[in-house]
Regions:
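Catalytic Walker B motif of ABC-type/P-loop ATPase nucleotide-binding domains
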Residues: 163-166
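The feature captures the beta-strand-to-loop junction immediately N-terminal to the Walker
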Residues: 32-34
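Helix-to-loop junction immediately C-terminal to a conserved catalytic motif
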Residues: 47
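Short coil-to-helix segment of the ABC ATPase nucleotide-binding domain corresponding to the Q-loop/switch region
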Residues: 93-102
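Conserved ABC ATPase signature
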Residues: 138-142, 146
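Conserved ABC ATPase "signature" region
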Residues: 63, 107, 113-134
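Conserved catalytic motifs of ABC-family nucleotide-binding domains
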Residues: 159
């Protein structure tokens, strides 16, 4: 498999210390660790939303850390998708307009798809995520799980090479969280590469591989391979045993 993401000796002030790892095309990789271990900081620095104080990051053949801020913003808009626990929806826009916002910006002045084509694409993806009836609603008129599925829809509208997810089901109840994880797993099974920060062993057990971060250092790694439904319980038990060995 091709290396999609390469991180080499990444430093960030006193938070990250020469962090190095690689991610393959089509992989679902979890970053775990206790609060304050540097998980979210790692995600922000790898994706170019923050500038590390040392080290390099590549997405494919593009060195992200060597780009200007404008070039990094353009790369995030066209080649990355993002899902955050806080969801980052615009309060005065309805669900459909929120979903369309980034991809409309990405298509502006580039001779890409028309607005009607993008709306049709958004509605198709909304049907896939079981939120087709929510397009005209305001963000205050839907449940947390529905809103997070709308965030997933928004994040994949530009057909990104990689999806970054920072505790996506963290603020949801158990049922809604399970639905969100199932949607992410479905995307991965369709070929989407996903880097997910999580403190939840059940979420991590659906991933192909887990990296354990402590005090800004990678302290361990667990390879699980692709999930088979019949092995779900055994995988979670294996992850929990490994986390105990890591000092979780």
């Amino acid at each position: 498999m091709d290396k999609l993401l390469r991180v080499e000796n990444l430093n960030k002030d006193k938070i990250l210390h020469k962090v190095s790892f690689e991610m393959e095309q089509g992989e679902m990789l979890a970053i775990m660790g206790p609060s304050g271990s540097g998980k979210s900081t790692l995600l922000y620095n790898v994706s170019g939303m923050d500038q590390p104080t040392g080290g390099k990051v590549w997405l494919g053949d593009t060195e992200i850390t060597g780009l200007s801020e404008d070039a990094k913003a353009d790369l995030r808009l066209h080649r990355m998708g993002f899902i955050f626990q806080q969801m980052n929806m615009i309060a005065n826009l309805n669900i459909l307009d929120n979903i369309l916002l980034p991809v409309m910006q990405a298509n502006k002045g580039k001779g890409g798809k028309s607005k009607s084509e993008l709306i049709a694409e958004a509605k198709r993806r909304m049907r896939q995520l079981s939120i087709s009836e929510l397009g005209s609603r305001q963000i205050t008129q839907v449940s947390g799980g529905q809103l997070q599925r709308a965030c997933i829809c928004r994040s994949i509208m530009n057909e990104p090479e990689i999806l970054f997810a920072d505790e996506p089901p963290g603020a949801l109840n158990k049922s809604a969280a399970g639905e969100v994880v199932a949607e992410l797993l479905k995307l991965n099974q369709e070929g989407m590469s996903i880097l997910i920060v999580t403190h939840d062993s059940k979420v991590a057990s659906t991933c192909d591989r887990i990296i354990y971060l402590l005090d800004g250092d990678i302290r361990g790694e667990l390879g699980l391979g692709k999930l088979e439904n019949s092995m779900e319980k055994q995988r979670e038990e294996r992850v929990n045993r490994w986390l105990m060995d890591m000092g979780w």
